Amino acid sequence: MLIMNLQLFAHKKGVGSSKNGRDSESKRLGVKSTDGEFVLAGNIIVRQRGTKIHPGNNVGRGKDDTLFAKIDGVVKFERVGKDKKKASVYPVDVEAIAE
């Protein structure tokens, strides 16, 4: 009687895969114009999620909670109450700066 012992081997080695190795792209949030900085109308002051900093005088809020300047002027960050912050833009007399 003929008995055959037949063993089949894989022709490619099995390679384990990692469950890591991916990450989301950074959103580049944060303050873009600092306190005392001159900004033009439309310039972004803060990119944020939620209203960590609230819009103050002459500052608008976009649909993604981005704060932007409505007029040309100087940015001022202010504290309102105990735990609230706001960003405002105040107009600057250009002739006073030139002198």
Curated annotation (Swiss-Prot):
Keyword set includes Ribonucleoprotein: yes
Database matches in PROSITE patterns: RIBOSOMAL_L27 (PS00831)
Record-linked InterPro entries: Ribosomal_bL27, Ribosomal_bL27_CS
Post-translational modification note: The N-terminus is cleaved by ribosomal processing cysteine protease Prp.
Molecular function per GO: structural constituent of ribosome
Family annotation (Pfam families): Ribosomal_L27 (PF01016)
GO biological process: translation
Domain of life per record: Bacteria
SUPFAM superfamilies: Ribosomal L27 protein-like (SSF110324)
Keyword Ribonucleoprotein on entry: yes
This protein's UniProt keywords: Ribonucleoprotein, Ribosomal protein
Propeptide boundaries: 1-9
GO cellular component, one term: cytosolic large ribosomal subunit
Membership in a protein family: Belongs to the bacterial ribosomal protein bL27 family.
Protein name: Large ribosomal subunit protein bL27
Annotated source species: Clostridium botulinum (strain Alaska E43 / Type E3)
